[in-house]
Amino acid sequence: AMLRGIPMHFLPRFDAQEVIRHLPSVTVMMGVPTFYTRLMDTPEFTRELCAAIRLFISGSAPLLAQTFEAFFAHTGHRILERYGMSEANMVASNPLDGERIAGTVGYALPGVTLRVCDAEHNPVAAGQTGVLQMRGPNVFKGYWQMPEKTASEFTEDGFFVSGDMATMDGDGRVRIVGREKDLVISGGLNVYPKEIEDAIDVLEGVNESAVIG
């Protein structure tokens, strides 16, 4: 956008009224999920206000399926959720042209290879939960002056171990289910807080939940 001279609005902090003031003059908005829930709680945020918008993008935190569906009902727009991290920038995205599925972060970006593996770095079957690993030109080379940590975070074949638990379906669509360190073992079963939160969040009267174990 900057190279093409496209005007951009950088706000010092999120303020729903200030965002609403700018919306009629912009075509793309990027934000975290909380921005979108707060906008929907603001009476002035209407479908008509979004008439000029081509695309709403979400990242930096998981977008609840309920927020995705509520935003679509409110505005007619399906938020494009994507996934990345400081060590790799963006690695996956729902398609710009194509189906955007609530609760997923889409497919690996061009040039990026993603896989879901077990604790021994062996790829798991489609639909099974494991640790998301990534490889590509966007992935960093290592932690500054921390060779031991760098070695522990990369596999022998050059994949960075993200620490995010995920599933990947047969066509490569990725769903993030939690963090590896958040795993709770109950009755011999692996339980991920995100899975419990998803079950609670669909209950009537629940806007959002947080599970800590």
Task: Walk through the language-model features, giving the residues of each.
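Gly/Ser/Thr-rich phosphate-binding loop
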Residues: 3, 8, 23-31, 40-101, ...
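Conserved beta-loop-beta connector loops within the AMP-binding
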Residues: 65, 115-133, 152, 168-171
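Active-site glycine/GP-rich loop and adjacent strand/helix microenvironment
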Residues: 94, 106, 125-126, 141-145
